């Protein structure tokens, strides 16, 4: 009676499994840290315990941190240079018109991490949303533009009163505002962007 011989592939796979098991056991028993002389760690702060399980707080994924909104310096370039982050202006029609800045983030409570819990992160766009929807404003402009409702909605109160008193500039101002709104020339007065509808 002869025993069946397993295929060579199974023997090789079993040998690799044993080799992996022994290497894992031997690496867990190692007590002295391994030094790597060719690594440059000057760019990142050195953690307290390099063999520990904690990750630097600044390396945490987005779901484990909460970030503030970008700081509004209201056009003050000196304040932006002193703080080294924040926005001089908000909004823009094209990607190139929008400033980008870092924001202050904090690790959430209950998340264990190494290093300072507050840090600067990201390249966030200087955009704010204040509840202005393009389609709503376009409908206001089309149906009630002669009464200045579109300008009131966007916060341009002075020109809205003038448009109301002249009944949309006898239709000319109504038509011009409709074209300006469609082409992006008429935006909210607080420099916010249009809210998107998903």
UniProtKB/Swiss-Prot annotation:
Glycosylated residues, chain numbering: 29, 40, 76
Membrane topology: Multi-pass membrane protein
Cytoplasmic-side segments: 150-166
Residue ranges crossing the lipid bilayer per the database entry: 129-149, 167-187
Name of the protein this chain belongs to: TM2 domain-containing protein 2
Residue span, TM2 domain: 131-179
GO CC terms: membrane
Topological domain ranges for the Extracellular compartment: 28-128, 188-198
Family statement: Belongs to the TM2 family.
Main location class: membrane
Pfam family, one: TM2
Annotated keywords: Glycoprotein, Membrane, Signal, Transmembrane, Transmembrane helix
Signal peptide: 1-27
Subcellular location as annotated: Membrane
Source species, domain of life: Eukaryota
């Amino acid at each position: 009676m002869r025993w069946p011989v397993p295929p060579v592939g199974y023997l090789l796979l079993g040998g690799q499994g044993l080799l992996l098991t022994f290497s894992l056991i031997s690496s867990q028993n190692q007590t002295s840290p391994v030094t790597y002389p060719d690594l440059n760690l000057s760019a990142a702060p050195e953690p307290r315990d390099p063999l520990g399980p904690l990750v630097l707080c600044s390396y945490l994924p987005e779901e484990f941190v909460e970030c503030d909104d970008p700081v509004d310096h209201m056009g003050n370039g000196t304040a932006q240079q002193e703080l080294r982050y924040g926005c001089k202006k908000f909004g823009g029609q094209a990607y190139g018109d929008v400033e980008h800045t870092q924001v202050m983030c904090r690790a959430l409570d209950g998340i264990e991490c190494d290093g300072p819990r507050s840090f600067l992160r990201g390249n966030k766009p200087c955009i704010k949303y204040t509840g202005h929807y393009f389609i709503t404003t376009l409908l206001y402009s089309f149906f009630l533009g002669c009464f200045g409702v579109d300008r009131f909605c966007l916060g341009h109160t002075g020109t809205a009163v003038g448009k109301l008193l002249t009944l949309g500039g006898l239709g000319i101002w109504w038509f011009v505002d409709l074209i300006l709104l469609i082409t992006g020339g008429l935006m909210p007065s607080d420099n916010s962007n249009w809210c998107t509808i998903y």
